[in-house]
């Protein structure tokens, strides 16, 4: 299981640094890892993220020991499960 780096940072007494990703870019995920971000947040509500992109972002971020959270386009079970099945560790649900 991938450790939740947001909770880990908070447990050590500091706020987690989270990189906000508005479009799919593995280069930005790697750059965020190299400059010290703790996690990636995917903006699936305002940006377009195909399932393959979500898979790849989670894979690369987890390889750098970063958690991935996401804002899903809709709070229906389809979207929630699609993001969770890809490896996202936390969700922001909209319009609840």
PLM features per residue range, with description:
Residues 1-19:
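N-terminal amphipathic alpha-helix/helix-capping segment at the start of soluble metabolic enzymes
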Residues 2-4, 46-60, 75-78:
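Active-site-adjacent beta->alpha loops and helix N-cap segments on the catalytic face
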Residues 17-19, 40-42, 68-70, 91:
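Hydrophobic faces of well-ordered beta-strands that scaffold small-molecule active sites
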Residues 21-24, 70-77:
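Glycine-rich beta-to-alpha transition loops that act as phosphate-gripper elements at the mouths
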Residues 28, 35-55:
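Glycine-rich, proline-tolerant flexible connector loops at the mouths of alpha/beta enzymes
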Residues 35-39, 85-90:
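Glycine-enriched alpha-helix->loop->beta-strand junction motifs that scaffold or abut catalytic
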Residues 77-86:
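Catalytic cores of alpha/beta
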Residues 94-96:
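Conserved small/polar residues in nucleotide/adenosyl-binding loops
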């Amino acid at each position: 299981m991938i450790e939740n780096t947001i909770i880990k940072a908070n447990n050590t007494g500091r706020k987690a640094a989270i990189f906000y990703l508005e479009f799919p870019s593995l280069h930005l995920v790697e750059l965020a890892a190299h400059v010290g971000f703790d996690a990636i947040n995917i903006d699936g509500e305002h940006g377009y993220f195909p399932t393959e992109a979500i898979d790849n972002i989670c894979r690369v971020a987890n390889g750098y020991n970063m958690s991935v959270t996401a804002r899903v386009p809709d709070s229906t079970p389809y979207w929630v499960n699609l993001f969770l099945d890809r490896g996202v560790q936390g969700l922001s649900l909209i319009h609840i």
